[in-house]
Amino acid sequence: MAFLIHLLVCTFGMGSWVAINGLWVELPLLVTELPEGWYLPSYLTVIIQLANVGPLLVTLLHHFRPGCLSEVAVVFTVLGVGTIACTLFAFLWNVTSWVLGSRHSIAFLVLTFFLALVDCTSSVTFLPFMSRLPTYYLTTFFVGEGLSGLLPALVALAQGSGLTTCVNVTEISATTLSPETTRNMDSPQGASSTLVSKLAGTAPSGIHLESRYLPANFSPLVFFLLLSFMMACCFISFFFLQRQPKRWEASIEDLLTSQVTLNSIRPQEGKDLGPPEESGKAQDPPEEKTAPQHLAHLTFIYVLVAFVNALTNGVLPSVQTYSCLSYGPVAYHLSATLSSMASPLTCFLSIFLPNRSLPFLGVLAVLGTSFGAYNMAMAVMSPCPFMQGHWGGEVLIVVSWVLFTGCLSYVKVMLGVILRDHSRSALLWCGAAVQLGSLLGAVVMFPLVNVLRLFSSADFCSLQCSA
């Protein structure tokens, strides 16, 4: 029975971010298909953070009107909306509309908002629900949350999304064009574009390389249908989890009974040590000393949670195309997918190698931040980053993204475990810190990418960088 509950909890955790993680790993294909192009990741980052209105509303209601929200009903609503939105994505992802004189993926962006609303709200609804379960199920939940990145990444690897080839293109100077001149640019899933010309009176003026996107093994329609299936599995898992509260309530009652027994014994033990007044006086000073330390302890944890999530959910995702795509589509594809796989593997590792030491977690956060700084530096140097055109540069950027995600994922998991042992409300505020950090990261990066345009893009095949 315990194994079944672990399986249900893992599947339930998978639904927390599977939809948005699915969008991120599909980006190598989507940036070639949608009119936003290289700017698409920064658009997604801002839209995802705008969806923080969901967790903000839930947090405020919990604080000012505790008990007014049915926890189970909210989770069911979140999972239902996520399943429906993923299904609509499969059929509307490439629908574009004219806005302000140019084409934009309005349907894609609107559905992204609803998916983000689901996933962001899960941070302040799923974790409080997990407080009903024994502590050891929380690690299983984080493993499932990590699988929300692993499974879409595996599907994206099988899809082979966003891969390109370089082809020679001959430029021609036309003097007289025959009526038979045609240019075929229709290519579902980024298939290679071809130029077929039957020209009269033309002369070649030059040859250069251009990128041509190879067709994926299966379309985004299939990919998004698989995402909707994963969300449906999460919905079903939660249905069975919330229908078995009696076992957990019984275990809580047993725990409370044992605490009552211990409390009834402790005064008797105190009588042997001296008068109650003296023992009470002796205990007061340590409590006064530890209160500020306890506050500083929690403050450090919440600040670290916000900082780590600002990097992983707001700052670095906005510039992943710029830091990776200059090294080629393969480097971008592997960085997006393998870094998504690093998160669940790190969560799984934390089961066997847990370390709750805050100094250790602080050092690990600094290490992960250093890898993030390298990724950001390569994005700033785009389209000619360090070792561009050399296989060593491709390896470095992929490894850097994997280690960046892995280090900070471990920090996030262990901070969540620490707060789970503290109290139920601590997990709620942990979710709020997650979303606040993510929001700040996105708000900082969007104007840098889309307004000031500090990052430059280029065609990989025609790119010429000085040695």
From Swiss-Prot:
One of its GO terms (biological process) is cellular response to heat. Signal peptide: none annotated. The chain crosses the membrane at residues 3-23, 44-64, 72-92, 106-126, 138-158, 221-241, 295-315, 334-354, 360-380, 395-415, 426-446. It is found in: Cell membrane. Glycans are attached at N94, N168. Residues 1-2, 65-71, 127-137, 242-294, 355-359, 416-425 are cytoplasmic. It comes from the Eukaryota. Residues 268-288 have a biased composition (Basic and acidic residues). The modification Phosphoserine is found at S251. Its main location: membrane. GO terms for molecular function: riboflavin transmembrane transporter activity. One of its GO terms (cellular component) is plasma membrane. Residues 24-43, 93-105, 159-220, 316-333, 381-394, 447-467 are extracellular. InterPro entries: Riboflavin_transptr. It is a multi-pass membrane protein. Keywords: Cell membrane, Glycoprotein, Membrane, Phosphoprotein, Transmembrane, Transmembrane helix, Transport. Residues 266-288 are annotated as: Disordered. It catalyses: riboflavin(in) = riboflavin(out). Plasma membrane transporter mediating the uptake by cells of the water soluble vitamin B2/riboflavin that plays a key role in biochemical oxidation-reduction reactions of the carbohydrate, lipid, and amino acid metabolism. Belongs to the riboflavin transporter family. PANTHER family: SOLUTE CARRIER FAMILY 52 (PTHR12929), SOLUTE CARRIER FAMILY 52, RIBOFLAVIN TRANSPORTER, MEMBER 3 (PTHR12929:SF4). This is Solute carrier family 52, riboflavin transporter, member 3. The lineage of its organism: Eukaryota, Metazoa, Chordata, Craniata, Vertebrata.
